[in-house]
Each structure stands twice: as C-alpha cells, then as structure tokens.
Amino acid sequence: MEPPMEQSGGEQEPGAVRLLDLPWEDVLLPHVLNWVPLRQLLRLQRVSRAFRALVQLHLARLRRFDAAQVGPQIPRAALARLLRDAEGLQELALAPCHEWLSDEDLVPVLARNPQLRSVALAGCGQLSRRALGALAEGCPRLQRLSLAHCDWVDGLALRGLADRCPALEELDLTACRQLKDEAIVYLAQRRGAGLRSLSLAVNANVGDTAVQELARNCPQLEHLDLTGCLRVGSDGVRTLAEYCPALRSLRVRHCHHVAEPSLSRLRKRGVDIDVEPPLHQALVLLQDMAGFAPFVNLQV
C-alpha cells in the first residue's frame, strides 16, 4: 500500500526522508509498528490522516491482540473499531472486557478469524453457549482456551467444545462450577489424547471419577490444577501417578482428601506439587540430599 499524500506542517530539508515516506508494507509495518505498544499506536493515529491510515492497516494485519495492552478497561465501541478489519488473528485475549463482552460483540470477531489458536475469555460472564459454539465450529485450529470464572460454562457447552476442537492442548476451566464429573469424563474421552494442560480448580463438583478418567486418557498431560476440588482424593492422584508419565506439575492445595502416600510416587519422579510434604518426609529428603543424618533426630 502506498502512503497517502498529505501536506507537511512545515518546510522539509532537501533530501530529508519523513517516516511516512518509507515503504509501508516492506518497512514500517513489519519492522517499526510491530515493535510499538498498541496503546502508543492508538495515540499515534491521532497525529494525522496518514498516520491513522497506517495504524488501521497495521490493525488489520494483527496476529495477536491482547486488550490489556490498551488499558485496564476498554469501551465496547473502541474494541469494535480496533478489531473491525482484523482477519488474521491467531491469539485473542479479552479479559479486560469481561464486564460487558457479549455474544454479539465476540461472535463476529470469531467468524472473521478462523485461524485463531489461542483465546482467553477469563471472567467474561456475559457470554453464553452461543459464543463457545461459534468458537468451536469456526476455529478448528484452536489449541489454547481460557474460560476461567465463566459461570455459564456447563456440561453441554463443554461437550460441544470437545466434539469440535481436535487440536485443543490447553484448557482453563477454573471456577466453572456447573461442570461435573460427567462433563470432564466426556472431555477426557474425546480430547484427552492431545491435552497437555488443564485447570479444574475451585470446583467442588469434580471428584476422583473425573481425575481417573483424565489419567487414563491423557498420556501427554503435563500440568493439572485441582486446587480446591474438595471431592478429589488419593485414589485419583494414585491413578495420575500410574497413567501420566509426562506429568510435570500438580496443584492439590485445599484437596483435603489427598494424602501424602498418594503424592510420594509423583514427588519421587520430580513432579512439582504445591503441597509441602510432612515434616518427617521433609527431613528424610534433606538427609538423602545433604547427608545430615548425624544431626537430625527423625523420631522428634
């Protein structure tokens, strides 16, 4: 795209080259604007019509959009303008829009961007199954999705996601309290083979049935967050230890039915667990690592 002609505000030195005289497609867009924070670009477009055209062209070519880069809060009209021409997005994060973002705001954006691979909608409580259905059906390459604190996500919504997202690898369902074991079991059976990271934190409806099914169907699972899942117990953790060789981190804080013996096998494999071992176990580990046996009375 050629830069539009615009009158200079003053005289230009002979031989001088203005920023906008540089090739837009080959120089300014890939090598300049890509390194300028989005908030600064929005200010830049107020300078002149030419700068506005340049910024709009940049926005249309965006691959990644994070509303947090604009500010802690972003008005509905501003988001619509920013994403009006974007058709190549691969990453979309809209958490700062959580107070007002609706299906009507989101669905058109999803329809224009079928290449999306990562979508973050944490806390967006005004959405519904319709938005999730549009995402699942229209974005087959989706790999990462955050629906944390989206109370509207229920078993039916999750089933639709599991049926239509073959590339799904990371899923955050923190505090999606309508989800029960049956929905997680379905997810595991449909998409478990590719799942690497899953959060079911802060959901008292999730228990050992779901965890055991995840373990048996998710051989590549690396990160599992069960924080506050009060129905999860030692049986589920033992199954994880048996069937998940790739597991690297496990979060079980406030899971009061998970006992240390079920965690010890994972600890020996080097899995990062957010619950400290009992004092006796800690002293034994210290003895093994540093050879402090003569100085430690393990009977205390």
Curated annotation (Swiss-Prot):
LRR repeats lie at residues 141-162, 167-188, 194-215, 220-241, 246-267. Residues 113-269 are annotated as: Interaction with SMURF1. It is found in: Cytoplasm. The modification N-acetylmethionine is found at M1. Gene3D superfamilies: Ribonuclease Inhibitor. Pathway: Protein modification; protein ubiquitination. It holds the Pfam family LRR_At5g56370. Keywords: Acetylation, Cytoplasm, Leucine-rich repeat, Repeat, Ubl conjugation pathway. Part of the SCF (SKP1-CUL1-F-box) E3 ubiquitin-protein ligase complex SCF(FBXL15) composed of CUL1, SKP1, RBX1 and FBXL15. Belongs to the FBXL15 family. This is F-box/LRR-repeat protein 15. The gene is Fbxl15.
